UniProtKB/Swiss-Prot annotation:
GO terms for cellular component: extracellular region. This is Tachykinin-like peptide-II. Its main location: secreted. The modification Methionine amide is found at residue 17. Expressed by the venom gland. Keywords: Amidation, Secreted. It comes from the Eukaryota. The lineage of its organism: Eukaryota, Metazoa, Ecdysozoa, Arthropoda, Hexapoda. It is found in: Secreted.
Length: 17
């Protein structure tokens, strides 16, 4: 779960997207 999101942040927050 350390894949970069569209925001460039680590996917440590499932509710980030």
């Amino acid at each position: 779960a350390s894949e970069p999101t569209a925001l460039g942040l680590p996917r440590i927050f499932p509710g980030l997207m």
